[in-house]
From Swiss-Prot:
Protein name from the UniProt record: Kinesin-like protein 1
PROSITE patterns: KINESIN_MOTOR_1 (PS00411), KINESIN_MOTOR_2 (PS50067)
Top-level taxonomy: Eukaryota, Fungi, Dikarya, Ascomycota, Taphrinomycotina
Main localization category: nucleus
GO biological process terms on file: meiotic spindle assembly; microtubule anchoring at mitotic spindle pole body; microtubule bundle formation; microtubule-based movement; mitotic sister chromatid segregation; mitotic spindle assembly; mitotic spindle organization; protein transport along microtubule to mitotic spindle pole body
One Gene Ontology CC term in the entry: microtubule
Molecular functions per Gene Ontology: ATP binding; ATP hydrolysis activity; microtubule binding; microtubule motor activity; minus-end-directed microtubule motor activity
Positions bound to ATP: 575-582
Gene: klp1
Function in brief: Microtubule-dependent motor that is involved in microtubule organization in the mitotic spindle.
Coiled coil, from the record: 193-266, 284-305, 344-481
Length: 832
């Protein structure tokens, strides 16, 4: 009995493990079909995979327990062999009967379970009830006897049979028992280790499967909710599309009616226009004179009104019709494409999910078949599935956002269509209101255009007269004029000098001051009396020290106008070193910069009269009777040869190997002036620390052409900053500075000789041609056509208010007086 109880304990222990596994699996099987009923087809597939996984683990555990059960059965058979020998036939019959009754039940159970798994795919709730009944049958089988020994014991007890074993049988049983006991202890230890190992593996498999199950359930819930939302949105989109189609049909009918109306209206307008044009022909000719004194702005306003009316009557209606049709067709096509795209993406998402589910099933099967896979590999698969699931969720969010955007676009398009329909109605009203005035406006515009053409022709004729009168005025003022400008005291000189002690301006308050008095040193007469020796000078204009560059430019702007009109003009700045010549000519607000600004501003007004001008310029320097190009520093170092050429027909002067720049903008001129100023020859003398040792000549070529009258004018503006004149005794120049000073004084003397010769030639009564010594200096030869026949010349004599420079100031004023006394007669007007 002790042996029998021991074996029963071992057998019952094995069956207890199997029963625990079955109980656990049974609870899962009972719980799972109830949830399958509440989910869709994808949920059923995921649950089916999990059931297969658990059932296979159950089979694995059953195999382990089966091995133990076979071992225990063998031991029990050895122990109970004497007991069962007398009833062997009854035992075999009972076993066969039990197998016959138990095996069919087990087969039915398996078939029923398979049927339940397959039926869940079709959402049938009655199969869930059948699954529940099958599980009850499994529990009933668990409550039955677990092994053959129990069956035999129950059979013997029910029959009341009891038999004692013989001594031989007892010895055999004891010896067999001892042998089997030692063998079974080893086997039990081995099976115990294997059982523990399999239990750990099974536990890990269950944990992983439970985790995967939770993730799949969450995924199913999210996907089902997103899919239901997508279906609702798709249904709403279809309803909106139907409404849009209905509105499209309505708008199409309205478009046809509008086209017929437009065609009739256009035909009637054309007929009316032709009739009215003929009837008003005679009336227009009689009323031309009555509109001669109307203002020019009426023509422009009426032209704009006609353009608006014509555009509103013709092009805008057609354009809006085309836009309406294009918008309707495009909107319908977009709605169809969007709906088809959403349906296609939904189908594609479902297919991808099904494909992914099938892949997961295959992965689970492979995972179950290959038990050697590690836990890390399984977790990697789960993570990859999560990533793919997140991607799908992101795609669903993107589709939802697209759908919302399309709804917003549809709403905005509908509003635009309503606005367009209202606008078309307003256009039709305007067309009806403005149709009557169109013919009158057109006739009036034609009259004003003819009047405008007449006025433009008169304006061109007046422009020619203006140029002639302007030139006559300049010739009356004198083709050679002299302006005197006195520079103010510097801050360092104010405490030491006083302007009133040196210079006086007797007609300072006059409209155009022209007199200047230079106060000399005291002189003692032969009788012993002392008196002030003053020198009075008179020029075309005298500028006091407080005069700025803008007031000076006002006086020379008329000469700039002559250059634009096609004459050669030269403006000189003459004076001793430090008298303000460079400030007058080349400063930021000097005569060169202000002349360029004035020219550009005036050319913009001439452009309205049909004139097109081209400006070109060059900047030269004459140093020691050698010409240099200030715009090309590299060539200055090479010192190329610059020959001067004169064109007698064009009365233009050109220089070889010199850079000529096209001036399209003002900034180009200012950049050129800065570059030229950096390359100029400057040296220090006793008279001035930074004395200009050369003459600079800025030559601006002004070429204009009128596209309507075919008139051409070519003028040249020369702005010259002469080198400072110095007395050798005062400057104390030696060496190179001495040669520079001598060359400067020589060229200035040649300039005076040329001007004096021009005056003599103009006043000569003989018919012989007087000689003008242009070739005595590079400066005078370069400015040949800007000093002589038909040219306008202005010389600034810049003087210093310092008493220490009295003699230099006196010499400069005497030279300027010599130039001012030169009178050049009126020259015939040359066509340009």
């Amino acid at each position: 009995m002790v042996i029998e109880n021991t074996k029963d304990i071992s057998i019952n222990t094995g069956y207890k493990r199997q029963e625990d596994a079955l109980n656990t699996d049974s609870e899962d099987l009972i719980y799972r079909p109830k949830k399958i009923i509440k989910t869709n087809q994808e949920d059923a597939v995921h649950d089916l995979k999990y059931e297969n996984f658990v059932s296979k683990n159950h089979v694995l555990q059953s195999d382990i327990n089966g091995k133990k059960r076979d071992s225990n059965r063998d031991k029990a058979a050895v122990v109970t062999a004497p007991i069962a020998s007398t009833h062997e036939s009854n035992y075999e019959e009972s076993v066969s009967k039990f197998k016959e009754s138990w095996l069919p039940q087990l087969k039915d159970l398996i078939e029923s379970h398979k049927t339940i798994c397959e039926s869940t795919l079709a959402y049938e709730s009655d199969q869930a009830m059948a699954s529940s009944n099958t599980l009850k049958r499994i529990k009933d089988l668990k409550s039955k006897p677990k092994n053959i020994i129990q069956l035999e014991r129950l059979h013997m007890l029910s029959n009341g049979e009891h038999r004692l074993l013989s001594k031989d049988e007892t010895d055999d049983i004891e010896s067999a028992y001892l042998n089997l006991r030692s063998h079974l202890q080893v086997q039990e230890q081995v099976y115990a280790e294997k059982d523990h190992e399999y239990s750990l593996q099974l536990q890990s498999y269950r944990e992983a499967a439970e985790k995967a199950k939770q993730d799949i359930l969450e995924t199913k819930e999210n996907l089902s909710s997103e899919l239901s939302i997508s279906n609702i949105q798709l249904k709403e989109a279809k309803e909106r599309l139907e409404a849009a189609n209905a509105s499209y049909q309505k708008l199409r009918r309205e478009h046809k009616e509008l086209a017929l109306y437009h065609e009739k209206k256009t035909h009637s307008l054309v007929c009316n226009l032709n009739g009215e044009r003929k009837s008003f022909g005679d009336f227009v000719e009689n009323e031309v004179k009555s509109y001669k004194h109307e203002y020019a702005n009426i023509c422009e306003s009426l032209r704009r009104a006609l353009v608006l009316i014509q555009g509103s009557c013709t092009e805008k209606i057609l354009r809006f019709k085309e836009k309406i049709l294009d918008l309707l067709e495009m909107k319908q096509q977009e709605e169809n494409d969007r709906i088809s795209h959403i349906e296609y993406e939904n189908d594609l998402t479902v297919k991808k999910l099904k494909r992914r589910i099938s892949e997961l099933e295959m992965a689970v099967k492979e995972y179950e078949s290959e038990k050697s896979y590690s836990e890390k590999e399984y977790e990697e698969k789960i993570s990859s599935l999560r990533i793919e699931l997140e991607d799908k969720l992101a795609e669903i969010d993107m589709l939802r956002n697209k759908l919302l955007k399309e709804e917003h676009k549809h709403h905005s398009t509908s509003e635009k269509l309503e606005e367009l329909s209202k606008y078309v109605a307003s256009i039709q009203d305007k067309e009806r209101n403005n149709g009557q005035n169109a013919l009158e406006l057109q006739a009036r515009i034609q009259q004003l255009e003819r009047r405008n053409e007449d006025m433009y022709n008169k304006l061109l004729a007046e422009e020619i007269i203006r140029r002639k009168l302007h030139n006559d005025i300049q010739e009356l003022k004198g083709n050679i004029r002299v302006f005197c400008r006195v520079r103010p005291l510097l801050p360092s000189e104010e405490s030491e000098y006083c302007i009133a002690d040196v210079l006086q301006f007797p007609d300072k308050d006059a409209l155009e001051p022209q007199k200047l008095i230079l106060k000399g040193p005291n002189v003692e007469s032969s009788l012993g009396h002392t008196y002030d020796r003053n020198y009075e000078f008179s020029f075309d204009r005298v500028f006091a020290p407080e005069s700025d560059n803008s007031s000076v430019f006002e006086e020379i702007s008329q000469l700039i106008q002559s250059a634009i009109d096609g004459y050669n003009v030269s403006i000189f700045a003459y004076g001793q070193t430090g008298s303000g010549k460079t400030y007058t000519m080349s400063s930021q607000d000097g005569m060169i910069a202000m002349s360029i600004k004035h020219i550009f501003n005036y050319l913009s007004t001439l452009r309205e009269k049909g004139w097109v001008y081209k400006l070109r310029g060059q900047f030269l320097e004459i140093y020691n009777e050698t010409i240099y190009d200030l715009l090309n520093k590299a060539e200055m170092l090479k010192n190329p040869k610059h020959d001067i050429h004169h064109d007698e027909k064009e009365r233009r002067t050109t220089v070889d190997n010199v850079s000529i720049i096209d001036f399209n903008e003002e900034d180009t001129v200012y950049k050129m002036l800065n570059r030229a100023g950096e390359n100029r020859f400057i040296a220090a003398t006793k008279a001035n620390e930074r004395s200009s040792r050369s003459h600079t000549v800025f030559m601006l070529y002004i070429d204009g052409e009128n596209s309507r009258t075919k008139q051409i004018c070519k003028g040249t503006l020369n702005l010259v900053d002469l080198a400072g004149s110095e007395r050798l005794s005062y400057s104390q120049a030696v060496g190179d500075r001495l040669r520079e000073t001598q060359a400067i004084n020589k060229s200035l003397s040649c300039l005076g000789d040329v001007i004096h010769a021009l005056g003599n030639a103009s006043n000569s009564t003989t018919k012989e041609k007087s000689h003008i010594p242009y070739r005595n200096s590079k400066l005078t030869y370069l400015l040949k056509y800007s000093l002589g026949k038909g040219a306008k010349t202005l010389m600034f004599v810049n003087v210093s208010p310092l008493k220490s420079q009295f003699m230099d100031t006196l010499n400069s004023l005497r030279f300027a007086t010599k130039v001012n006394d030169t009178k050049v007669g009126s020259i015939k007007h040359y066509k340009r």
